[in-house]
């Protein structure tokens, strides 16, 4: 169970999953097309036609969410590696997102597959990083809006309060603000073209699927985080902060308690 050779579902179940619409399409292509569909619906001038276009858009997103839920249930019922299934459900709730915010429904199935399920039996540090790199988490907790001079603390607070150390574990508001500054520039971009940057910033740009680190939006000042001094130098600050969080005794206590309660 800890080292499954591969999930082999019964033929009938696998065929049912394979028959689902869009199952073989690249997920971020789907998300980009939905983004465009939503924008087009909002630009319709006639009120009745606009309402109809928005209803079609919402229904299409609901269909995607139901498809993802059906796939999850089929795997939970029929997959032979049940430890992976139970841990996938545990981590999916631990790193939870709300699918009815914005258009998260479109990618919630991919979030479960690539960020959670793929790392459910692995190291916590990798799981934390995988959720950060998925656009669903960044959109849900508003980090796509987090930029130098315009801090949004939602994701930073959630990481410390729920994902790692836990409430009342000794961190301060200053630590939350420092982590929010570290996370500036970490966001989403579904466009194929790169953002316009100054020549000296271009080497710092990172794009992986819909994940983007935009150095023009990052706070490059030094930070003091949980007693550690973090030099302002870009995306590597996030790795340093995550290493600090994952090695903190409060994180071990919080995660161990959550797992013990679940099992």
Describe each PLM feature range.
Residues 1-94, 98-110, 115-117:
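N-terminal accessory alpha/beta regions
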Residues 39-61, 65-72, 104-263:
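Active-site substrate-binding loop specific to GH73 endo-beta-N-acetylglucosaminidase modules
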């Amino acid at each position: 169970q800890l080292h499954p050779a591969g999930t082999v579902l019964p033929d009938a179940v696998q065929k049912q999953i394979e028959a689902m619409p869009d199952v073989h399409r690249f997920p971020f292509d789907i998300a980009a097309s939905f983004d465009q569909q939503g924008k087009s619906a909002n630009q319709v001038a006639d009120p009745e036609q606009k309402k109809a276009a928005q209803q079609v858009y919402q229904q299409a997103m609901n269909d995607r969410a139901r498809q993802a839920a059906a796939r999850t249930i089929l795997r939970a019922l029929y997959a032979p590696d049940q430890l992976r299934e139970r841990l996938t459900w545990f981590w999916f709730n631990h790193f939870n997102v709300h699918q009815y915010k914005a258009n998260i429904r479109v990618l919630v199935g991919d979030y479960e597959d690539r960020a959670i399920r793929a790392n459910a039996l692995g190291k916590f540090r990798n799981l934390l990083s995988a959720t950060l790199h998925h656009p669903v988490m960044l959109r849900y907790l508003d980090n796509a809006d987090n930029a130098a001079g315009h801090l949004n603390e939602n994701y930073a607070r959630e990481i410390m309060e729920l994902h790692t150390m836990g409430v009342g574990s000794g961190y301060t508001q200053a630590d939350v603000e420092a982590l929010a500054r570290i996370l500036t520039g970490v966001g989403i971009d579904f466009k194929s073209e790169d953002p316009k940057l100054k020549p000296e910033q271009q080497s710092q740009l990172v794009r992986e699927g819909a994940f983007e680190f935009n150095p023009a939006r990052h706070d490059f000042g030094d930070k003091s985080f949980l007693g550690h001094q973090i030099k302002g130098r870009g995306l590597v600050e996030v790795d340093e902060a995550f290493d600090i969080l994952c090695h903190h005794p409060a994180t071990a206590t919080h995660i161990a308690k959550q797992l013990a309660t679940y099992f």
